[in-house]
Amino acid sequence: VSIAALASLAACGGVKDSGSASGDADVITVGTTDKVTSVDPAGSYDNGSYAVQINVFPFLYAQDYNTSELSPDIAADDGTWSDDGTEFTVKIKSGLKFANGHDLTSSDVKFSFDRVNTINDENGPSSLLANIESIDTPDDTTVVFHSKVKNDVTLKQVLSSPAGPIVDEEVFSADKLTDADTIIKEKAFAGPYILTSYKANEVAGYSKNDSYQGLTPAKNSTVQVKYFADSSNLKMAVQQGQVDVAYRSLTPTDIDDLSKDSKVKVVKGPGGEERFLVFNFNIQPYGTKSDEPNADKAKAVRQAVANLIDREELATKVYKDTYTPMYSYIPDGLVGHEDTFKTAYGDGNGKPSADKAKKVLEDAGVSTPVELKLQYNPDHYGSSSADEYAALKAQLEEAGAEVELK
């Protein structure tokens, strides 16, 4: 069980009178510290890889710019459920083509999802397809998903997720990952862009795909993405005009500094990234493998912590407003976002409540002070993690908890 805390925002770009970082007015150069695990969608489930895939592969459904709602991408309709709720039928557009001239039909759609499950790569998104029993293709433009869950409300989100890119069955392997060189050489793309060149985690080149018939056509002809080792190098690239746009990830301090630079424009919006505080059900206070297991008391401890976290303080003081307080499992900007935690925990308006936490513990018969062990990774989730967890420790201790931080 996790406590949603923060959701990210912000990208930075240089403001220029003309031209671009590449020297070509038609080329946009993007800088990022993200890493790409795999260009093949079956081999990755991370932001860096998805940033490549979402630009070169089509989906049945996607989000248009500036909206959280899903709309048809290469689908021709919104899909329909059977009367018994076990089959979801999608019609796809006719005459679809990959950049290499291969036809894109329902067979490619079925192939794309089936291979994710068959390959079941340890870094891949196969877990997202757990509710899909099987897929049928009665004709070239019809796909039928047989669902294990009746009227599964998450299915369309899954079809638009990292498990959802549609690939060319004439190029991709059915039972193993296909390397980036082969994918590029065979032009196996049907998304807004074509990946024209790629050197792993160094540079990627994209050109507009004129045959794309989906929701979000490219608005420029060429994009170049440069990959940086860390945020300090990315910040320097912005300041020196080496990139037009910096997206994922600059530190809060970097963004704060760049926002004061008249040559740089900082754009803020929903980022889709979340930060959670997660409990281990086994070893948390009163956990299943603790000295005194008790499900009701364990739940009370989790609820008490949820009542004590000051999300606004973390967002402002630690992350300098590059994150926003989050009161949902689903971040702002994605379908299904609702601030349900805002009224469920704390004072009902987004702030913490020590009194409410105390009552929850008392009602469950939990003795105080509660001893908590917080553990975090100092670099994997950003350089501000140490400050974030120090602030969390202080918040919990102020309310009387005893916190060990590692």
Residue ranges and their predicted role:
Residues 210-257:
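Ligand-site clamp/hinge motif
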Residues 160-216:
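Gly/Pro-rich hinge or "lid" segments in bacterial periplasmic/extracellular proteins
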Residues 324-363, 379-385:
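Structural transition elements
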Residues 77-122, 138, 144-146, 294-297:
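Aromatic- and charge-enriched surface segment that lines or borders ligand/interaction sites
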Residues 126-172, 197:
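Surface-exposed binding/hinge segments that line
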Residues 291-336:
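Periplasmic-binding protein-like
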Residues 361-395, 405-406:
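Ligand/substrate-recognition segments at binding pockets and active sites
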Residues 31-81, 114, 188-189:
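N-terminal lobe/hinge region of extracytoplasmic solute-binding protein
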